[in-house]
Amino acid sequence: MSAPIPAAVPSSDALVLASIANGIGTITLNNSTRRNALSEALLDQVIAALDDFKTKEVRVVILRAFEGATVWSAGHDIKELPQANQDPLGYSDPLERTLRAVRAFPAPIIAMVHGSVWGGAFDLVASCDMIIADETCSFAITPANLGLPYNTTGLMHFLGRLPINLVKELFFTAAPIKGNDAYKWGIVNHLVPSAELEVFTTDFASKITKKAPLAIAVAKEQLRILTDYQPIAAQIFEQLQEMRRTVYDSKDYTEGIQAFLEKRPAIFTGK
């Protein structure tokens, strides 16, 4: 049994901590004051860590929150979303860039989850190759709470991983899927007791480091291409974009963002 990789301790020095041990790269979300909100600065550091790991031929990556975090990540940093008349989740959005980096990284990435995962952080975790979690885990996708139009790529990520009825429940209710239910639905690969999470994840990652890295890299890329291949006519794509535009141009979107920033319940009118 392998010793667990030392957990990072939250500090104000870095939003993300990165380390390598025994062929395993560990990326630790480290912004305790903002509950690991996915700000552009934090996500840029995640991408930089992945780029560094690639040059050092890391065999597997563990993506985790700092030790003791009860919220794995609060999701998008709402303060950075445009308040009206701009696509909040466009192709160049920092989270979208990070998701592409995670999915294209040549080695497996394991999300190790202790605590709750909200909004865009669920998309980040789901874009990892595997999820190992403990009984404290929960997963919620929350655009309905904000009046936010989720992008088509994000919807396709979830449809590629989960049954459509569960995707609808997640998007329509914004209610968290917890522990055993997350395992039952296949959101997580392994659900283990909290006390065993780090050792189990490290042992699991260690097994991968002993396998053929080129074969794994090619299999991962093949699977990415096959699952991403969803031919959509240009006319249909434009129609989907226009539907989203009606949301981010709406009063409801402005109200949802303002209500969140003002820490009050949103009053949606459907306009």
Tell me the role of every PLM-derived stretch.
Residues 1-14, 258-271:
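Terminal low-complexity tails and localization/encapsulation signals of metabolic enzymes
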